[in-house]
Amino acid sequence: YGNEQGTGAGIKQGLQQAGLKREDIFVTTKLYNGDQGNADKVTNAFNGQLQALGLDYIDLYLMHWPVDAHFIESYHAMEQLYKAGKIRAIGVSNFDNDRMEKLLEAAEIVPAVNQMEFNPTNQERDILTFDQSHGIQLAAWSPLGGGRSLKNPVIEKLADKYHKTAAQIILRWEWQRDLIMVVKSVHEDRIISNSQIFDFELSDEDVQTINQLDEGKRGLWYSDFQWHDPNAKIANAIDHWDDTDPSKPL
């Protein structure tokens, strides 16, 4: 997301101030869609990211989206980085079951993680079940679901019942469903509040109540991008992927 250099500087400063070591923290970054391709291309991109972060290794390296023409060879390149000790775990993002099946058929190493949009109104049940059956951990991006989930009357009622915020109710529900939650905020008070979910537990009945809120409404999916239309002239053309780093030559 163009923030690796700043993140690296923050990590260095934070470790020094807190008296911590590199192994005390867990760092995840992603392979740009525009950097997918053969081993040389992926490796060069990864080395650039490592340099920007100022680190010797990455704890988890994720493929951002499955570029249909390249995700298999890109994953093989990631496997080689894993074997070389540059990555401690490899994973993917936004893989539906069809693409995950294709990847598993070709992969030597099962992805540790599949990062998906997941929240009370978009629960990706089929993908969650498939991933869990293959030992793949689902990590939730957009875990709070925006206003559609946070302002849901059911969530608000549970927040009153447990004397917690709506966000804390949602995050606790996801924690009890064995998910990793990728929560973002620039507000210190919200960051602290979002972490305070371990002093209470939702009842099984309340977990099931939130389970019933699923509407299957994704905020972002393949159909939202022109490059996933097989009839489009730029289908799978990596120089048109939205996250292609503009500072790099195509």
Regions found by a protein language model. Give the residues of each.
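N-terminal binding-site loop/beta-alpha segment at the start of enzyme catalytic domains
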Residues: 1-25, 239, 244-250
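Aromatic/hydrophobic pocket-lining residues that form the small-molecule binding cavity
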Residues: 7, 42, 46, 71-74, ...
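Acidic (Asp/Glu)-rich catalytic clusters
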Residues: 8-22, 47-56, 80-82, 104-107, ...
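A short, structured active-site edge motif that brings together acidic residues
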Residues: 21-35, 59-64, 94, 118
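Acidic pyrophosphate-coordinating catalytic loop
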Residues: 33-37, 68-71
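Short, acidic/polar
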Residues: 37-53, 100, 122-123
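Active-site groove signature of glycoside hydrolases
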Residues: 53-69
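Beta/alpha (TIM)-barrel catalytic core signal, keyed to glycine-rich beta->alpha loops juxtaposed to Asp/Glu
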Residues: 65-250
